Amino acid sequence: MAREFSLEKTRNIGIMAHVDAGKTTTTERILYYTGKIHKIGETHEGASQMDWMEQEQERGITITSAATTAQWNNHRVNIIDTPGHVDFTIEVQRSLRVLDGAVTVLDSQSGVEPQTETVWRQATEYGVPRIVFANKMDKIGADFLYSVSTLHDRLQANAHPIQLPIGSEDDFRGIIDLIKMKAEIYTNDLGTDILEEDIPAEYLDQAQEYREKLVEAVAETDEELMMKYLEGEEITNEELKAGIRKATINVEFFPVLCGSAFKNKGVQLMLDAVIDYLPSPLDIPAIKGINPDTDAEETRPASDEEPFAALAFKIMTDPFVGRLTFFRVYSGVLQSGSYVLNTSKGKRERIGRILQMHANSRQEIETVYSGDIAAAVGLKDTTTGDSLTDEKAKIILESINVPEPVIQLMVEPKSKADQDKMGIALQKLAEEDPTFRVETNVETGETVISGMGELHLDVLVDRMRREFKVEANVGAPQVSYRETFRASTQARGFFKRQSGGKGQFGDVWIEFTPNEEGKGFEFENAIVGGVVPREFIPAVEKGLVESMANGVLAGYPMVDVKAKLYDGSYHDVDSSETAFKIAASLALKEAAKSAQPAILEPMMLVTITVPEENLGDVMGHVTARRGRVDGMEAHGNSQIVRAYVPLAEMFGYATVLRSASQGRGTFMMVFDHYEDVPKSVQEEIIKKNKGED
């Protein structure tokens, strides 16, 4: 089958926002207008098409990023709906990794909110062009120009309106197009009947002022337009649109649109803007990767003629077809039934069926082309972030960074029958979600799960119950502490045992130094002259890695330490891998005496919004929880406080805030960094852990 839409006519976009900005409703409307749905599902009725997991429909939030294909103005638009809740950051990250452009949805009453900042920062890291849709213009307190100002103040974004609203709240009835300088008036509830009229007289001055600002802002990004603008020449609508497109694709400019997805206003114009201003796969730089055979950097331009290269960005378990692997094709063509090489794992995989997804229904296709997003059935070894390529043209594409989990829970099956099922369920859930870890405590035999937040683990335990029919008891959430060294030291590990026959002998000198935050453990072999034979070096590293899994102070994993093996000795007969492993772990214990070991705790960036009169309470809450205030701003009658607070102090805070503010306060928190715990707290943690043992 030939290609249905050319690469120029393909758009891969994500819809990203703060929780509750109306993102899923916006996606619903896109699917409605592009002819994919016959009846609109409302999120607050629990009937949304994209939110297809049972829990999402109950909670009214989007958890998994379903990928959907739609058509608009003879273009194919692949849409990835991303969650707005901070506990699901990895979902946002992995969808950003495979997108070409994004629509950032704002709530017009609140403007830029905490999670908007997080996803905006991630999109900037990945260099994703964006347009902004100020949604909920029908809501009480909606303020379009305030929303635009928050883009400047909180994100330092070069964002400018290309539309203005006509009316707001209940009176929101149309949109002014600042490029055509026309008004689009809505005459029915479904938003399908639109009258294009001249701009109403009372809005004309404002429209001319913002048109002028728009032209100037776009001209600043383009030398030719700047010359025309300065010489007072007329810039045509076509030139203005071309200038906006170029600057948006170069991530120098962000067009801002307005509307109300719930009231069916502004969504079609936003779809037009997706086509007009967001890039096709041809507009973005060719993807780079490493050839695993030569270690040389290679590129794969978006073209069907190039060898096949794709990135797996999501694994899902589907009740009907089993394991689904969502992937983005960067170059080449793939037929169902063919073989590909997973270059990340060095494994050959057979592509069973290829499906194009529409929320939770699917269409089987024979061929997938460059620039497309699809799901494959039948891949056994592929996980999130793996590269799939032509067997004759290997390349490893840049993977997806996975943040470390910050919270853990103990889970135990309720019955023997649940025990076996729980193992399988947890393994499948961990395959789908790289930020979800499952470990067994060797000493107690307990299963410990860890993730990005309480909601994250709640949802996973819930899925275990619903999808895998496993009943489990869940312990109270615990903080994932880490340990590290704060000073450099040298230490000897010496192990010798003689018990008749062959003995054991291992002797090492290791220099330990603190490593940069986030660098993890690094091992360096600096042995000269074979004082420790080469075959025992891996055993020394392994001994350190295994010992560091249970740190020296309270048994938490050790991070950010460099170890340099620089001296030692061996015995011709008695030395063995085991002896050197034990010697390395003894060196680590010895180093702990002088390397200033410290316990680290996750610090959360907490954003608390409260009525003015509760500001004093909130400041007290932050101080009492060992937090430090980072900034404050007023918004209407509310105060927004940003603070860094240890996760350990935030359990149960929702209840405290609710009673202090009579239910009017809200807060969001997102993991920010690890930090040393104060000495007094460290002693408590050590005492508690020793007591438990």
Curated annotation (Swiss-Prot):
GO terms for biological process: ribosome disassembly. Its main location: cytoplasm. GO terms for molecular function: GTP binding; GTPase activity; translation elongation factor activity. This is Elongation factor G. Catalyzes the GTP-dependent ribosomal translocation step during translation elongation. During this step, the ribosome changes from the pre-translocational (PRE) to the post-translocational (POST) state as the newly formed A-site-bound peptidyl-tRNA and P-site-bound deacylated tRNA move to the P and E sites, respectively. Catalyzes the coordinated movement of the two tRNA molecules, the mRNA and conformational changes in the ribosome. It is found in: Cytoplasm. GTP binds at residues 17-24, 81-85, 135-138. It holds the Pfam family EFG_C. It comes from the Bacteria. InterPro entries: EF-G-like_DII (IPR053905), EFG_II (IPR041095), EFG_III (IPR009022), EFG_III/V (IPR035647), EFG_IV (IPR047872), EFG_V (IPR035649), EFG_V-like (IPR000640), G_TR_CS (IPR031157). Disulfide bonds: none annotated. SMART domains: EFG_C, EFG_IV. Keywords: Cytoplasm, Elongation factor, GTP-binding, Nucleotide-binding, Protein biosynthesis. GO terms for cellular component: cytoplasm. The keyword Protein biosynthesis applies. Residues 8-282 form the tr-type G domain. Belongs to the TRAFAC class translation factor GTPase superfamily. Classic translation factor GTPase family. EF-G/EF-2 subfamily. The keyword Acetylation does not apply.
